[in-house]
């Protein structure tokens, strides 16, 4: 089992939602208006100097093939995003148990 966190700029929410729907991934926890800054990326703090927010979706994957399909789709989405700072990030980790 794996768990993945998808982190992306709020303007990409429709694209991420469509991607998840296309893969029949209808199970996730979402955080909106997330403030943050990645390594060598612009900050998103929801302020005038640092506009915008991020969104985070946490998804547990009992089966790894579905996660691999999502990773492939994120690579595809990122090809269409010019600015490196705006690319979608996915962090994958082992998941030991779901209770």
Language-model segments: residues:
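Positively charged, small/polar-rich N-terminal and surface patches that mediate targeting and assembly
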Residues: 1-99
């Amino acid at each position: 089992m794996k768990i993945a966190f998808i982190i992306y700029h709020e303007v990409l929410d429709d694209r991420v939602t469509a991607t998840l729907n296309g893969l029949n991934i209808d199970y996730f926890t979402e955080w909106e208006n997330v403030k943050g800054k990645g390594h060598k990326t612009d900050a998103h703090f929801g302020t005038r100097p640092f506009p915008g927010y991020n969104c985070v979706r946490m998804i547990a994957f009992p089966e790894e093939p579905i996660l691999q399909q999502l990773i492939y789709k994120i690579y595809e989405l990122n090809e269409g995003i010019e600015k490196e700072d705006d690319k979608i990030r996915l962090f994958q980790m082992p998941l030991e148990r779901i209770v």
